[in-house]
Amino acid sequence: WIMGHMVNAIAQIDEFVNLGANSIETDVSFDDSANPEYTYHGVPCDCGRTCTKWEYFNEFLKGLRKATTPGDSKYHEKLVLVVFDLKTSSLYDNQASDAGKKLAKSLLQNYWNNGNNGGRAYIVLSIPNLAHYKLITGFKETLTSEGHPELMDKVGYGFSGNDEIGDVAKTYKKAGVTGHVWQSDGITNCLLRGLDRVRKAVANRDSSNGYINKVYYWIVDKRATTRDALDAGVDGIMTNYPDVIADVLNESAYKAKFRIASYDDNPWETFKN
């Protein structure tokens, strides 16, 4: 999965997919009442990027729905996964469940079209703080109470805080999560970070009793780092330059081993080599 980073304006969906992304990451900020409000990152952000592009969250969802609904004039067949980077650090811990409930309602109405031929992309809810795990339970409860528990088949989870892998496993247990786990590791492109924790995550993914289904690394903008991440065995790479990742995947060393994921590749299944 080539994951376009910080895609917060509707116009950027086309831009990143046309550069080679089959997945995008979108920032979601919340108001004081735990309503998802804007797709917005703010300052500071990655080096070389504009930090301030934004939409109202529900409007972004409508644009995203068009981009992922077959038959729509804006449809992109290859856009198959969306990571919502949930900026919950502005909330109190006890608001996490409410944030999950409100997020589920927004997605149900504006993205899934109340279960009636909505957008088809898989969704990863990425949460920065382990203490906010109740966002997941609130989300799940709401889709169930609104009569659409089947949509949970399209939803996965990630904690983005670079926490100890054992602590993340315990938190999923508390949240009742037993699959659909995308584990991320990384740092802003302005800084360097080694691949030690990525290798630990890959080892967990590939062990018989691991909880991780997919591992992705962020933020990768250079060819050399892309090769290092692929050599470490990641499933996804988040980038500001999807075309760079696509170029490396076309190199003879990687062409035989990797391919771009399509809609038929289940993002919740651990790939067995």
From Swiss-Prot:
Cofactor descriptive note: Binds 1 Mg(2+) ion per subunit.
Principal location class: secreted
Record's keyword annotation contains Transferase: no
CDD domains per record: GDPD_like_SMaseD_PLD (cd08576)
Catalytic activity: an N-(acyl)-sphingosylphosphocholine = an N-(acyl)-sphingosyl-1,3-cyclic phosphate + choline; an N-(acyl)-sphingosylphosphoethanolamine = an N-(acyl)-sphingosyl-1,3-cyclic phosphate + ethanolamine; a 1-acyl-sn-glycero-3-phosphocholine = a 1-acyl-sn-glycero-2,3-cyclic phosphate + choline; a 1-acyl-sn-glycero-3-phosphoethanolamine = a 1-acyl-sn-glycero-2,3-cyclic phosphate + ethanolamine
GO terms for MF: lyase activity; metal ion binding; phosphoric diester hydrolase activity; toxin activity
Residues carrying a glycan: 250
Any one Gene Ontology BP term: lipid catabolic process
UniProt entry keywords in alphabetical sequence: Cytolysis, Dermonecrotic toxin, Disulfide bond, Glycoprotein, Hemolysis, Lipid degradation, Lipid metabolism, Lyase, Magnesium, Metal-binding, Secreted, Toxin
Annotated Mg(2+) binding sites: 25, 27, 85
Disulfide bond residue pairs: 45-51, 47-190
InterPro entries membership: PLC-like_Pdiesterase_TIM-brl (IPR017946)
Entry's localization field: Secreted
Names of required cofactors: Mg(2+)
GO terms for cellular component: extracellular region
Tissues expressing this chain: Expressed by the venom gland.
Active site residues per record: 5, 41
Family, as annotated: Belongs to the arthropod phospholipase D family. Class II subfamily.
Protein name: Dermonecrotic toxin LdSicTox-alphaIB1aiv
Organism: Loxosceles deserta (Desert recluse spider)
